[in-house]
């Protein structure tokens, strides 16, 4: 949090839009009020004077950055010395004047410093002289040791690596998945970020063919000049096409669904070092198996995607009780052909109200001066608010009743590409050392919406989960992908929460995550695989009943199990492990319980609801660690 505060309070570089300036000003005055009250109450009212220089400095800094947005120098603030008229003039331009053009001498430094957030490269291990590297994902919770990292830049390079290595193969995308979906222990790890070029573009047919490690933001920049937009992409433009294909992503597109619905064809490198072209009509078994199957069989080298016209969209939002949402969606959103994007945010900690946001096609003029969002934007304020919402009491209430009404006040009209130009940096904390932010996602048939919502809320409350936000999207059925998470029309619950990085907390999260996965399976839904793989093998197959088709296909096309990652290390070919556990002759009853995930979780619930003498999370973890060290209960 410190770096973010410094950027707001002490930095005079950068720019602030009107809405950002308003929020920054509100934050400064609220902070001043809290500190003033504490000093006045604890020490004396005379000591409150020490806050004045800090208040003036902060207001001067953020006002300077607002003037930069208007292409003016911070020296304009000296107009306040002119009685009445100077203050009135500054107030009007700071709070009401629209932004000036993006490129001006006050903000050019940002272009040099910022790009879309990227995860760092694999880390060398200092005490080893070999090629081993540590590969981690965005949460920092699940590092994986790989034997070697290769960096191909072409299909020929990939073929060369596959021919000349006997190690298992894992493939690196953007590494924004939150377990080990891009890595496997002791594998040859392919860092494919060099394969990021446009292969073919057809403006008339509205299609584009790209190398699979091109990011969505790079495609947007390429096609925006032709007034075209990506048909279906992932929420954040940082992610690669390969990563999105591997997880069969979706977004807020109301008339669409999973990414596979907008894919024309793919070019795939198989484990036998052959290149195949696959589509709905050619090698369709490979096509339907590749998309959404997390690099289990092949390397998706290139993809041909469908495009749409880039149109203006207008924001419309409505707050309502959660119980009224399904009827509202069916009556006002699903039946409206002009709706382009739609999602809602459910407010923790009570989950009784939501804010539904729709972006509708419009002929109105955009309220932003640029066709694409500022890719170098500073997210200091967002980081501070995320920390406040997650750490301080009553601030979730403050967000619902104070912050969001301000954020959603006024008219907003964007171009479709602008609204799809999100940077995952706005979710990234300054540090993930002691705590981290994590995503989960659940797909619920729309007719079971209220049933699942009530169970979800109860689980989060009982386990005291630090939920930041629950956002929902809509998706139409996908009957093509073997790993389809939308076998019927669904609502997608995207859960953003905060957890500590301690082993006790990891164990606690695993327990309530599996409980929630049971809840979504009970309503004939599914959980999303890009996140922490806590589910049991039984839960996996219940959520993805077509997975056995893919296992059969993998045994045919990758009999040596060359293509791997933590997902398939966990769920593929687990029969041997299950047999080993079932035939174990351990005499410890505690060990028998903790060797079985189902009974281990039931024991956690017993500690939580019946034997509630000690904190169940710490006590459960202590017992589980003790059983690993002992072979009996004595």
Feature-to-residue mapping (PLM):
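C-terminal substrate-binding/cap subdomain adjacent to the FAD-binding core in PCMH-type
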Residues: 246, 264-458, 462, 466, ...
């Amino acid at each position: 949090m410190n770096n973010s505060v410094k950027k707001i309070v002490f930095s005079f570089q950068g720019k602030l839009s009107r809405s950002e300036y308003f929020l920054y000003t509100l934050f400064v005055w609220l902070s001043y009020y809290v500190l003033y009250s504490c000093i006045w109450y604890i020490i004396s009212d005379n000591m409150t004077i020490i806050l004045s220089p800090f208040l003036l400095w902060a207001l001067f800094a953020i006002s300077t950055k607002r003037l930069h947005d208007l292409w003016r120098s911070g020296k304009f603030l000296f107009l306040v010395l002119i009685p009445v008229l100077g203050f009135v003039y500054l107030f009007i331009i700071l709070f009401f004047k629209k932004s000036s053009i993006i490129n001006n001498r006050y903000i050019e430094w940002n272009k040099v410093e910022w790009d879309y957030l990227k995860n760092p490269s694999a880390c060398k291990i200092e005490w080893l002289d070999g090629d081993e590297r540590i590969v981690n994902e965005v949460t920092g919770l699940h590092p994986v040791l790989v034997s070697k990292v290769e960096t191909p830049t072409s299909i020929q390079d990939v073929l060369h690596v596959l021919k000349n290595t006997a190690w298992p193969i894992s493939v690196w995308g953007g590494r924004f998945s939150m377990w080990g979906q891009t890595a496997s222990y002791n594998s040859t790890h392919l860092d494919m970020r060099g394969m990021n070029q446009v292969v073919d573009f057809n403006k008339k047919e509205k299609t584009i063919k790209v190398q699979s490690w091109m990011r969505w933001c790079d495609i947007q920049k390429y096609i925006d000049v032709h007034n075209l937009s990506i048909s279906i992409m992932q929420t954040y433009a940082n992610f690669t096409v390969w990563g999105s294909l591997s997880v069969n992503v979706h977004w807020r597109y109301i008339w669409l669904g999973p990414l596979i619905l907008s894919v024309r064809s793919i070019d795939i490198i198989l484990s036998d070092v052959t290149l195949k072209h696959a589509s709905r009509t050619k090698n369709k078994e490979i096509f339907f198996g590749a998309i959404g199957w997390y690099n289990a069989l092949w390397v998706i080298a290139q993809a041909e995607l469908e495009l749409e016209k880039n149109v203006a969209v207008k924001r419309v939002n409505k707050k309502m009780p959660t119980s009224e949402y399904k009827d509202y969606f069916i009556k006002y959103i699903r039946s409206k052909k002009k709706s382009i994007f739609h999602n809602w945010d459910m407010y923790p900690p009570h989950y009784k109200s939501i804010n539904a946001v729709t972006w509708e096609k419009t002929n109105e003029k955009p309220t932003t001066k640029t066709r694409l969002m500022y890719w170098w934007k500073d997210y200091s304020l967002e980081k501070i608010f995320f920390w406040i919402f997650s750490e301080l009491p009553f601030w979730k209430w403050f967000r619902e009743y104070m912050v969001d009404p301000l954020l959603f006040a006024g008219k907003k009209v964007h171009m479709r590409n602008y609204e799809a130009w999100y940077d995952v940096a706005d979710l990234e904390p300054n540090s993930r050392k002691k705590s981290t932010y994590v995503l989960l996602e659940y797909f619920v048939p729309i007719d079971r919406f209220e049933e699942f919502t009530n169970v979800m809320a109860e689980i989060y409350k009982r386990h005291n989960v630090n939920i930041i936000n629950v956002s929902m999207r809509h998706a139409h059925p996908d009957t093509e992908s073997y790993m389809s998470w939308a076998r019927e029309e669904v609502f997608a619950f995207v859960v953003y929460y905060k957890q500590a990085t301690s082993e006790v907390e990891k164990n606690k999260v695993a327990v309530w995550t599996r409980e929630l996965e049971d809840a979504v399976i009970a309503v004939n839904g599914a959980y999303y695989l890009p996140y922490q793989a806590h589910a049991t093998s039984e839960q996996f197959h219940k959520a993805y009943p077509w997975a056995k088709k893919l296992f059969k296909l993998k045994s045919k096309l990758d009999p040596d199990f060359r293509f791997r990652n933590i997902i398939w290390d966990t769920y593929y070919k687990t029969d041997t492990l299950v047999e080993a556990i079932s035939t174990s002759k351990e005499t410890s009853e505690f060990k028998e319980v903790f060797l079985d995930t189902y009974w281990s979780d039931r024991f956690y619930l017993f500690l939580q609801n019946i034997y509630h003498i000690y904190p169940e999370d710490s006590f459960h973890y202590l017992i589980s660690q003790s059983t690993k060290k002992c072979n009996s209960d004595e």
